[in-house]
UniProtKB/Swiss-Prot annotation:
Source species, domain of life: Eukaryota
Gene (UniProt): CRYAA
Organism name: Macaca mulatta
Name of the protein this chain belongs to: Alpha-crystallin A chain
Major localization class: cytoplasm
Deamidated glutamine: residues carrying this PTM: 6, 50, 90, 147
PTM-bearing positions, type Phosphoserine: 45, 122
An example Gene Ontology CC term for this record: nucleoplasm
Residues that bear Deamidated asparagine: 101, 123
A single GO BP: negative regulation of gene expression
C-alpha cells in the first residue's frame, strides 16, 4: 500500500520563505503546484512532494575530502559523458566544467551545463593529480599531499578516465 507523506504544517505555511525547486538543476523532470504558486502552499493539496527530500547524491552536491595524505573531490555528473567534461588546474584552483548540447529525454529536449571551482590545498602535489569517472557517474578528482607545496602558477588539463565499476563515494 502506498502512503503519501504530508509535509509538516509549518513548512507548508511558510510560502515564499520556503525554497522552491523551480531553480534546481533537474530541468525537465516536471514541476509541482508549489513550484509555480508558493504563496498558495497552504491551500494546495497537502499531498504534494518537495525537492528538499531528495538524496544528497541525487542533488548534484559535491563532497570534498582533505586528509593528511590526499585531497579528493567527489562530484555527481551522471548526466555527462567524459567527452562533455573538462577538468583543469589553474594556479591553485581546480575547475570542473560540464556541458552537453540539447538532446532528447523522457520529458522533451534538454541541455545542461555547470561550472565548479575548488581551491587546492597548497601542499597537494599538482604533478600527480588524477581524475576518473565511475560507471554510475561519480567524478573523482584526487591528488596526494606532500610536505611542501609546489609553485602553482601554470595551467594544466587533467584527463577524465572512465571506470567500469560504481563509485566508492558515500551516499550520505
Amino acid at each position: 500500500m502506498d502512503v503519501t507523506i504530508q509535509h509538516p504544517w509549518f513548512k507548508r505555511t511558510l510560502g515564499p520563505f520556503y525554497p522552491s525547486r523551480l531553480f534546481d538543476q533537474f530541468f525537465g523532470e516536471g514541476l509541482f503546484e508549489y513550484d509555480l504558486l508558493p504563496f498558495l502552499s497552504s491551500t494546495i493539496s497537502p499531498y504534494y512532494r518537495q525537492s528538499l527530500f531528495r538524496t544528497v547524491l541525487d542533488s548534484g552536491i559535491s563532497e570534498v575530502r582533505s586528509d593528511r595524505d590526499k585531497f579528493v573531490i567527489f562530484l555527481d555528473v551522471k548526466h555527462f559523458s567524459p567527452e562533455d567534461l573538462t577538468v583543469k588546474v589553474q594556479d591553485d584552483f581546480v575547475e570542473i566544467h560540464g556541458k552537453h548540447n540539447e538532446r532528447q529525454d523522457d520529458h522533451g529536449y534538454i541541455s545542461r551545463e555547470f561550472h565548479r571551482r575548488y581551491r587546492l590545498p597548497s601542499n597537494v602535489d599538482q604533478s600527480a593529480l588524477s581524475c576518473s569517472l565511475s560507471a554510475d557517474g561519480m567524478l573523482t578528482f584526487s591528488g596526494p599531499k606532500i610536505q611542501t607545496g609546489l609553485d602553482a602558477t601554470h595551467e594544466r588539463a587533467i584527463p577524465v578516465a572512465r571506470e567500469e565499476k560504481p563509485s566508492s563515494a558515500p551516499s550520505s
